């Protein structure tokens, strides 16, 4: 298994799909990295040489991925909560942020129903 950005990349998948195992790299970004490095999308990771894997590592290193990206996202959410803005308050209360209705629905965000104690 090739190891890129601290993640074991699946060997038996095509390169374009295998790179999406890294948090922060989707299919479009994966295609862009492969085009930049000059590797075909339909080549399996097991067929790549060490030199090509090193080129992939360099291509992925140009982006914010994995732990750094997770940290950045959580810091952005924490900043919104500290500011006390509307989005921060909605995060704090675990409610939908983007104007969805909450009288009905929104169960995924709110969690299971809590019974009213009498």
From Swiss-Prot:
Q: Where is the signal peptide?
A: none
The alphabetized list of GO BP terms reads:
translation
- Assembly: Part of the 30S ribosomal subunit. Forms a loose heterodimer with protein S19. Forms two bridges to the 50S subunit in the 70S ribosome.
- Transmembrane portions of the chain: none
Q: Which InterPro entries match?
A: Rbsml_uS13_C, Ribosomal_uS13, Ribosomal_uS13-like_H2TH, Ribosomal_uS13_bac-type, Ribosomal_uS13_CS
Single GO term (MF): structural constituent of ribosome
Instruction: List the GO cellular component terms.
Output: cytosol; small ribosomal subunit
Q: Where is this region: Disordered?
A: 94-118
Question: Which family is it part of?
Answer: Belongs to the universal ribosomal protein uS13 family.
- State which gene encodes it: rpsM
Q: Establish whether keyword Ribonucleoprotein is in the entry.
A: yes
Positions the record marks as coiled coil are none
Q: What is this protein called?
A: Small ribosomal subunit protein uS13
Species of the source: Vibrio parahaemolyticus serotype O3:K6 (strain RIMD 2210633)
Query: What role does it play?
Result: Located at the top of the head of the 30S subunit, it contacts several helices of the 16S rRNA. In the 70S ribosome it contacts the 23S rRNA (bridge B1a) and protein L5 of the 50S subunit (bridge B1b), connecting the 2 subunits; these bridges are implicated in subunit movement. Contacts the tRNAs in the A and P-sites.
> Which keywords does the record carry?
Ribonucleoprotein, Ribosomal protein, RNA-binding, rRNA-binding, tRNA-binding
């Amino acid at each position: 298994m090739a190891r890129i950005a601290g993640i074991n990349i699946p060997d038996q998948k095509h390169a374009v799909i295998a790179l999406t195992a890294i948090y922060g790299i989707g299919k479009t970004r994966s295609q862009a990295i492969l085009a930049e490095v000059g590797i075909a999308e339909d080549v399996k990771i097991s067929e790549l040489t060490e030199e090509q894997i090193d080129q992939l590592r360099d291509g992925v290193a140009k982006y914010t991925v994995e732990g750094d990206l997770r940290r950045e996202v959580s810091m952005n959410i924490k900043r919104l909560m500290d500011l006390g803005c509307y989005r921060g308050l909605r995060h704090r209360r675990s409610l939908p942020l983007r104007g969805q209705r909450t009288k009905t629905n929104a169960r995924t965000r709110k969690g299971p129903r809590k019974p009213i104690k009498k």
